[in-house]
């Protein structure tokens, strides 16, 4: 037997730029997303082909807004806010990394992941734009996250689409990003460093105490 799940997803996006003054520019956008889960379970055997249909539909509006305030000819402040729905979840265990982690579509029992993100940064160029520097902070809050219940292994769910396999919770992520970029000369490239923290909160995991996300990376240094 092979169990499969199917879904359709589509989106429309609109955005526009507004110059409110010589110093202040705004970009506003709106994304409309639609998701349909087609079939709770598709069961194929040598003798029978059964299809159980589901009419789980999600339609959401996702606003985005960014602002840029020019301090002078070489420096500016930028801020942004965005909302995002994710309809496909990566179901994993918090304790171990296994190659059997599964992508699971939203359904009646599994709501779409929802995230809000805020960002604010300072940007400055030097030597006639030869060098670019920036310091940016961000905060992201997430709801409707999923993980396997404690004591439940992903391979136990390989032949089942039961929503009872999962537990649901929230999370957040925040950090500071520093970037130095050289645009001209014999040597070009950039150096970036990120200090961040990503946590999860599940009532049924770790006794309800917050814990680091599976893919939390406290320090990240990139050189190109």
Regions found by a protein language model. Give the residues of each.
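Signature of Gram-negative outer-membrane beta-barrel scaffolds
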Residues: 1-72, 87-88, 205
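Transmembrane beta-barrel strands of outer-membrane/channel proteins
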Residues: 28-34, 79-83, 101, 122, ...
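Residues on the lipid-exposed face of transmembrane beta-strands in outer-membrane beta-barrel proteins
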Residues: 12-16, 65-69, 110, 120-124, ...
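Gram-negative outer-membrane beta-barrel transporters
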Residues: 22, 139-141, 159-224
